[in-house]
Amino acid sequence: IPTPFPRMTWKEAMDQYGSDKPERRFGMKLTDVSSIFENSGFKVFASAVSNGGVVKAINAKGFGSASVGQIDALTKTAVEAGAKGLAYIKVREEDWRSPISKFLSDEEKQKLTEALDIETGDLVLFAAGPWEPSCDILGRVRLQCAEFMELLKDNKERDFLWVIEFPLVGWDEEEQRWVAIHHPFTRPVKEDEQKLLSGELSADLRAQAYDVVLNGTELGGGSIRIHERDLQSAMFKALGITEEQAREQFGHILDAFSFGAPPHGGLALGLDRLVMMICNAESIREVIAFPKNNRGAD
């Protein structure tokens, strides 16, 4: 196993593979084609871009022969991930067979061909909307395409990867407040510390949080933790925790930080996931040693 493992930021992983645990043993990367559809006659794509979202696409090379059942299965995967449907194009020698083809201009088709290296026999699939959900939807569709195409059949490669710089905070629409993506003690990257201290909150704040990934499966995760009182207090404030609540719930931690605490962090491996991969099992339910339901029975 070659070391050190390569590193990829969370944003790069989502943008290119549509997953925070990317399967990199085959291509079919996500491509941003938003600029092609800014003024498109296909209003679904044009409105996604005008509303600040994106249009992402993948080219499943040579999969233009996908059956109706396979297209239906891909559509179901997209819908279950939050899409309203799944736009696709089957590229044939005589035409582009697609429910959306009639809305695309010749110029848009030419630009798509160049951006995605489209050839006869390809299957092009799209997702449109806010960036993160669109990446996630197309990432799931990408994996299912690979399964249908048997791209990983007999593949013995071990692709280890560190995914780093996960988001520090995210906006909870239901609660209308910022929440910690990992946990409230996660340290921001050095470049973002001052933003947290000054209350400049956004989903772009990056955490010193990381996962180790093997062949598209998360083996474990961890983070570097905050060890200064002022930074920890700023994090609590960002999450809507008042000074009184912080004192009541976490006073012992803040006091300890006042006297000085060493930089610290860690990593927890999911051994059940590792055993699952070794055994070629489909689920950790097949390998965990503990009872699998609340009655203590299999």
Language model: regions and residue ranges:
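Class II aminoacyl-tRNA synthetase catalytic cores and aaRS-like
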Residues: 1-298
